[in-house]
């Protein structure tokens, strides 16, 4: 007598509600992150717009983990990939509009594009964004800053959606900004922000942006596979910089597999071509160990690390 085949449990994507955006399985994240390493997303969701995102969040299985990513500029995805859902905001969240001295930006808008739009509109104060890789959503999440300014200095209000699909309007005080951090709950998703500029001649703004670009190219490995600043400065804007401590500990040029501490700026890790995420993370941890042994100061990761480590063969 023939035995009936045992029914297979539904895959994750089969358990998810219908969307107007795009749901995809087994999406390679190594093609997204600037390090060009890492395993796949089990399922990636690219919502069409805020309504699509909110509807999805209200209906999704609550036990399924959700991870939000941007353009992958300050991100290390581990080699075993990311289980559950990976949410990536796309074109529906990248619009930038100006009205008087205010700029409304979607969370997926590139920081550099926001700075460029402000310049064309004759607004100053946002030039620093031209030197920050990534999106406005990520900039708000970590209070990104460069060249003497931070996102908190120009934020009027932010829009976010909580895990239940409820929209919220948040003031800078609500976000409780600190050095490279915000008080935004980890499971809330930034969807847009209103930023403030000041009237200025576009040529003046252009000169400032050019100076920032030149300074960045002179001091950072901008043409390498890197994730930006690896560690936060231990005392914020005060005290020794992370790169100074790394240099003091003799880590400039240190290698682990295909990963290397940049010779140009030693708070940057580089994928020299064949690095794994494990190489990069292991090298970062070795840098932390050597800095602590040399200086007594503990460095904390600024690069966000997500996913699981690759399982070793048995």
Q: How does the language model describe each region?
A:
Residues 4-136, 144-146:
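Anion-binding (especially nucleotide phosphate/pyrophosphate-binding) glycine-rich loop
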Residues 24-25, 161-285, 289-314:
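Phosphate/pyrophosphate- and phosphate-bearing ligand-binding catalytic cores of soluble enzymes
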Residues 44, 104, 157-159, 192-194:
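Beta-strand secondary-structure signal
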Residues 46-47, 76-79, 87-88, 141-143, ...:
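Short beta-strand-to-turn element immediately C-terminal to the catalytic PLP-Schiff-base lysine
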Residues 97-100, 139-140, 188-192:
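Acidic/polar active-site rim loop that often engages polyanionic ligands
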Residues 110, 141, 146-169, 177-181:
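Glycine-rich, mobile lid/loop segments that gate access to catalytic sites or pores
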């Amino acid at each position: 007598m023939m035995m009936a085949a045992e029914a297979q449990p539904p895959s994750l994507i089969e358990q998810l509600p219908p969307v107007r955006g795009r749901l995809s399985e087994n999406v390679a994240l190594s093609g997204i992150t600037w390090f060009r390493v890492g395993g796949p997303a089990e399922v990636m969701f690219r919502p069409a717009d805020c309504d699509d995102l909110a509807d999805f969040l209200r209906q999704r299985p609550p036990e399924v983990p959700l991870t939000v990513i941007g353009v992958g500029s300050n991100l290390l995805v581990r080699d075993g990939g990311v289980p559950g859902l990976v949410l990536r905001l796309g074109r529906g969240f990248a619009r930038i509009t100006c009205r008087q001295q205010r700029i409304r930006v979607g969370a997926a808008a590139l920081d550099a594009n926001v700075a460029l739009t402000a310049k064309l509109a004759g607004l100053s104060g946002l030039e620093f964004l031209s030197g920050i890789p990534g999106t406005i959503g990520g900039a708000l999440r970590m209070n990104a800053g460069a060249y003497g300014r931070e996102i908190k200095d120009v934020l009027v209000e932010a829009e976010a959606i909580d895990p239940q699909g409820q929209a919220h309007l948040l003031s800078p005080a609500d976000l409780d900004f600190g050095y490279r951090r915000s008080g935004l709950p980890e499971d809330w998703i930034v969807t847009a922000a209103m930023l403030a500029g000041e009237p200025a001649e576009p040529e003046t703004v252009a000169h400032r942006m050019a100076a920032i670009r030149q300074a960045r190219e002179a001091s950072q490995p901008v043409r390498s596979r890197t994730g930006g600043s690896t560690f936060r400065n231990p005392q914020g804007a005060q005290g020794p910089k992370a790169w100074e401590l790394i240099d003091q500990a003799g880590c400039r040029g240190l290698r682990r597999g295909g990963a290397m501490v940049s010779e140009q700026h030693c708070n940057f890790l580089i994928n020299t071509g064949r690095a794994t995420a494990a190489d990069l993370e292991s090298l970062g941890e070795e840098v932390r160990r050597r800095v602590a042994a040399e200086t007594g100061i503990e460095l904390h990761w600024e690069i966000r690390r997500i996913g699981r480590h690759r399982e070793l063969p048995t």
